Amino acid sequence: MAQSTVESKNRKDINNGKIPAKETILSPRFYTTDFEAMENMDLSINEEELEAICEEFRKDYNRHHFVRNSEFEGAAEKLDPETRELFVDFLEGSCTSEFSGFLLYKELSKRIKVKNPLLAECFAHMARDEARHAGFLNKSMSDFGLQLDLGFLTANKDYTYFPPRSIFYATYLSEKIGYWRYIAIYRHLEKNPDSKIFPLFNYFENWCQDENRHGDFFDALMKAQPRTVKSLSKKITIGGSTFTHPLFDYFHRFRYFLNNLPLTSKLWSRFFLLAVFATMYARDLGIKKDFYSSLGLDARDYDQFVINKTNETAARVFPVVMDVYDNSFYGRLDKIVENNKVLSDIANSDGNKVSKTFKKLPKYLSNGYQLLRLYLLKPLDSKDFQPSIR
């Protein structure tokens, strides 16, 4: 049998074990970046704020927070089989996501510590937090007789390269959206304790503050590196080998000019906001809908709240944000969810691969069209939008 990323400690206790979730476009990703560019960053523009955030990290407010108590004893056995499967799937995805953050931050802290010690220390503290989160989630999985094989994940996961600019945008949004997701669940369960299916959720209030501090760090880092956020590398990498040439420098300067146009940063802001929002919405209203129902949450209302709040938060650092209040915004996201349901039905139906591909094509085209229309929606200028959220 092929090696699994999930190890069963006692498979008979969980209906002969859980098959690891199949990797899809909606699955958590593992990232790498240009470490040389990161270590050469000049932080002087906003070094004072970064030092203040690093001091917050040093205090490690949640050092003693992630300690399990007696509430965990027997909690797994109280869940019915359907809820158990939904919750284990949530644990697996969340643990993988946290572990992905740990690997990126840890590698950054090691690679840049000589030339950029302040930045390296910040990443080391965030790696500490992400490792703590992943370990706590993995411990909860052990209550169900399972554990993620994190070593296997490290060695066998495909790593996606993102330049520093993209890492800043994507990770900032990931941390901030994580804050709003956790605090929304915590507040809902605080008001509806009967829907709290597992004691893990008692930890979400303090947990989300780690996510918030991480997001604040990337906010400060982007303010310290406005050029790096908008520029591109002078090096070209082909087949693992790096090449430089004087012509690359001229080409780089032209691309640098384009990337420093005000319009460019606005386009990137819209791209990453839409990518994060659409991915979350499609996942939560598609494959995760029943999980939120088990918590007494309506997935659509929950996601719209989280998206609206994250969009407001992003206005503090991005030049523009999405117009989530446009009547068509959520309607088009709902259409993508509908298309994905049809695509899933086709994939699980009888028929050969060729016929299935032709049946899927209209829905793929429709999804592309919906995303394009969403991207082309007139954005909200952050300088006009910000006062309403402060």
UniProtKB/Swiss-Prot annotation:
Keywords: Chlorophyll biosynthesis, Iron, Metal-binding, NADP, Oxidoreductase, Photosynthesis. One of its GO terms (molecular function) is magnesium-protoporphyrin IX monomethyl ester (oxidative) cyclase activity. Its cofactor is Fe cation. It comes from the Bacteria. InterPro entries: AcsF, Ferritin-like_SF, Rr_diiron-bd_dom. Its EC number is 1.14.13.81. Pathway: Porphyrin-containing compound metabolism; chlorophyll biosynthesis (light-independent). GO terms for biological process: light-independent chlorophyll biosynthetic process; photosynthesis. Catalyzes the formation of the isocyclic ring in chlorophyll biosynthesis. Mediates the cyclase reaction, which results in the formation of divinylprotochlorophyllide (Pchlide) characteristic of all chlorophylls from magnesium-protoporphyrin IX 13-monomethyl ester (MgPMME). This is Magnesium-protoporphyrin IX monomethyl ester [oxidative] cyclase. It comes from Prochlorococcus marinus (strain AS9601).
